[in-house]
Amino acid sequence: IRDASTSRGLGDVYKRQGCDEVILYKSENFVEKVKYFTNGEGVDVVYDGVGKDTAILGLDCLKPLGTMVVFGNSSGNCPPIDPGLLASKGSLFFTRPTLMTYGTKEKDLLHSSGRVFEMLATNKIKLEINTSYNLSDVSKAHADLESRKTFGSIVMKNDY
């Protein structure tokens, strides 16, 4: 299951990448949709890159003993999570991983990046480059990224 915040057009992109279902979280009740798609069970893991707007609701998508992974905050910082809330929703786990923690040892970083490159090489991860900018337009690239005008991978081309 994948949620897309801006348009049905992104749903086509996500389906090409292997998603079975796409939910527009800003216009659909994504908790109800997740429960529907999972026959009321919920999911094992929620990966949330949005943060403030979706993190608490994401907890309601989880099965008991599920894991909430907040890795971004495009809508703002995630609100504080009360451990009692996690207990009441099924002994849930909550984490906010960062590359600075997981990539501190060279061997771990090489292992993790090697796994990603292997999945890219075997098409288990489908890379879509949807936007490219000249390096001289880096400020426009940042502005477009921050305003959510981009999706997928962005390539910066050296025009110097």
Protein language model annotation of sequence segments:
Residues G11-Y160:
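Terminal helix/beta-alpha structural elements that buttress the NAD(P)+-binding lobe
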Residues I1-Y14:
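Single conserved hydrophobic/aromatic residue that forms the stacking wall/gate
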